[in-house]
């Protein structure tokens, strides 16, 4: 019985081990590839739990999301013979899920070593070999990452379509200490020169600002003067218009008054012409004589009542009036 129990226990253990080796998990953002007897199977699997034949089938999980591959301490010899080292180069890339099988089949699951690491080493050495230290370290350093990205992506499009390079980041290379000090001194001098240039620009900017302020102030004064001048001109024009209106009104009033006076005089003259007839004048004459309380003496008194042609006789009668008055006064004195 004990022997049979041991056999049963061994069988259960084997079954448990087989189940344990058959069940596996693929993480999110990964693709599972399978090997049987060392041969890559065409079957791939996505995230989750999966089953496979125990003991004879194995799997590897290949990342298909963004990942960063680091290449460290890359040597590089410049055209001048100076050996420099790039401490760290980071390549951000991702693998398209549909291309996982072909990439793994052609370059194994560690495809990044064959396709990325080696290409970075090759491109950096090519770049350094045709440029001197000044160009690599300072002048062209900002172009290295972009050039590496373009060269790497172009090579991958031919050899392994499905790998996308998103970015390449290159750290400043390490250079010999003596050369580094010289570069530091040179950078210090450049910094001083830049500071001096910036100070000069600041002074020029301040002068330009002052000039613009003066121009703005002058323009403001000119605009104010122009506004005042226009205001005065408008006031004078307004006064002129008011004066013209007043003159026009005065002329109109005077003309109206003259027209009225002329009309009145004309009407009066017309009325007098119609009124002062010879008969009416004769009547007025008689009324005036009748209203006179004085007594006239003389032989020509009757002639006063003649027509206007007897004018001289009337005058002589008047003279007689005066003489008679004188005689009257003399007679009074004698008495």
Curated annotation (Swiss-Prot):
Keyword annotations from UniProtKB, A to Z: Cholesterol metabolism, Endoplasmic reticulum, Glycoprotein, Lipid metabolism, Membrane, Signal-anchor, Steroid metabolism, Sterol metabolism, Transmembrane, Transmembrane helix
Pfam families assigned: Band_7
Coiled coil region boundaries: none
SMART domains: PHB (SM00244)
Subcellular location field: Endoplasmic reticulum membrane
GO molecular function, one term: cholesterol binding
Protein name as catalogued: Erlin-2-A
Record lineage: Eukaryota, Metazoa, Chordata, Craniata, Vertebrata
